[in-house]
């Protein structure tokens, strides 16, 4: 018992006072904007269940410009009539720099369109997916498409340095 007490005392004395008094810092809220180029390629289903499902499987390849200088690759599943109504879900991994901070993170998409009008469209950071200087990243991205140009508006938080 005395050995354990001595060990605890030695540890307490050796820890810097600042480490003992640290309080968690609040995340910094940021806002990033820009546009991206995207290549969407149909993938051929390789099993009977995928063919029978009627779902379209597509690969995504993106180049982000602006506050997010990055590339991404991902996979999308889509259903619907292909022109005015449908839905898609997707996952993509983004690698590059966000406001100068390097790393990678994953995004998850969910969208519904009815008669040519988006009903829901969410794109959020997958919790725990941030790496490098983007570890702890959390946020949501809004995408608008006008005349074929994809613009993004990314509201996010990162732990303070």
Where are these regions (language model features)?
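Targeting-peptide/extracellular-domain and disordered-appendage signature
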Residues: 3-5, 11, 15-161
């Amino acid at each position: 018992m005395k050995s354990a007490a001595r060990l605890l005392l030695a540890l307490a004395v050796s820890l810097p006072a600042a480490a003992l008094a640290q309080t968690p810092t609040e995340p910094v809220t940021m806002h990033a904007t820009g546009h991206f180029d995207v290549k969407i390629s149909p993938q051929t289903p390789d099993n009977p269940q995928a063919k029978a499902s009627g779902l379209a499987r597509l690969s995504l390849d993106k180049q982000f410009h602006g506050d997010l200088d990055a590339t991404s690759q991902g996979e999308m599943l889509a259903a619907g009539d292909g022109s005015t109504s449908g839905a898609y879900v997707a996952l993509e991994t983004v690698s590059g720099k966000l406001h100068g901070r390097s790393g990678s993170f994953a995004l998850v998409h969910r969208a519904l369109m009815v008669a040519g009008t988006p009903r829901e469209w969410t794109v959020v950071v997958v919790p725990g997916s941030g790496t490098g200087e983007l570890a702890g990243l959390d946020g949501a991205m809004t995408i608008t498409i006008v005349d074929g140009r994809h613009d993004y508006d990314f509201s996010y938080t990162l732990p303070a340095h």
